[in-house]
Amino acid sequence: MENKSKYKTIDHVLCVEGNKKIHVWETLPEENSPKRKNTIIIASGFARRMDHFAGLAEYLSRNGFHVIRYDSLHHVGLSSGTIDEFTMSIGKQSLLAVVDWLNTRKINNRGILASSLSARIVYASLSEINVSFLITAVGVVNLRYTLERALGFDYLSLPINELPNNLDFEGHKLGAEVFARDCLDFGWEDLTSTINSMMYLDIPFIAFTANNDNWVKQDEVITLLSNIRSNRCKIYSLLGSSHDLGENLVVLRNFYQSVTKAAIAMDNDRLDIDVDIIEPSFEHLTIATVNERRMKIEIENQAISLS
């Protein structure tokens, strides 16, 4: 279902099993922009909504890309469910549902851009979906390490019955038992499991690390890439960045520029990101961000009025 609105961004609603709904936002290529072969799917990081990536969608659209974003089930954002029931497997289910929807629309040429925790979900999903290339930014490769750094304790080391009810992650209450049980039962938790998922990757892959990232070890990202049997992988560092790519405007702009260059390069079957881009003005980025926040509020208000 497509929700018509006055905004540039198009809101779609996917109905999935259990009468749940996934909201997908579509941004069309800017008029008269360069022609691109691939659509870009943006998989937001944990506790990040679609509208947090308004600026990146604007960068990609200005440079000719058709952009798809979505809010996972049981997460922050517009889709069904609450974050206290989120698991990595639910994140994977949400991604696969979006890809299935794109298949029904005959949108088969696509690259994925995933950040933080969503990168780990994408790594585990690549054997089940067809994509042209993968870009990750501060992508989690060792979930156990990242959780320990973020939460201050290695909760995955505890027996299930000794876990607290909730884990406080950046102000959000993550259901400890359901999340930990899913991690351990389905092998999400360590670097080895990530390597096993990615070993036979045969598509181009660019990984952006941040040199001040305390949640993801750069040497573990390098270890992951060294275990991929393809030679079509490359790592770049976002200098001056921490795991929070939006911590200030300089870091954020570097992130937008870098991944846009990577998308253009990979759309042209290259790993060298020394390419020119069209850069939106600060005014255009501000307008896009404000409009998407308004659109989100309107959608939330419509949902409340219908309930």
Swiss-Prot record:
Top-level taxon: Bacteria
SUPFAM superfamilies with a match to the protein in the record: alpha/beta-Hydrolases
UniProt GO molecular function: acyltransferase activity, transferring groups other than amino-acyl groups
GO biological process: bioluminescence; fatty acid metabolic process
Keyword Acyltransferase among record annotations: yes
Pathway in which this enzyme or protein is active: Lipid metabolism; fatty acid reduction for biolumincescence
Active-site positions on this chain: 116, 213, 243
Family of the protein in this entry: Belongs to the LuxD family.
Function: Acyl transferase is part of the fatty acid reductase system required for aldehyde biosynthesis; it produces fatty acids for the luminescent reaction.
NCBIfam families in the cross-refs: PRK13604.1
Protein name as it appears in the record: Acyl transferase
Source species: Photorhabdus laumondii subsp. laumondii (strain DSM 15139 / CIP 105565 / TT01) (Photorhabdus luminescens subsp. laumondii)
Gene that this sequence comes from: luxD
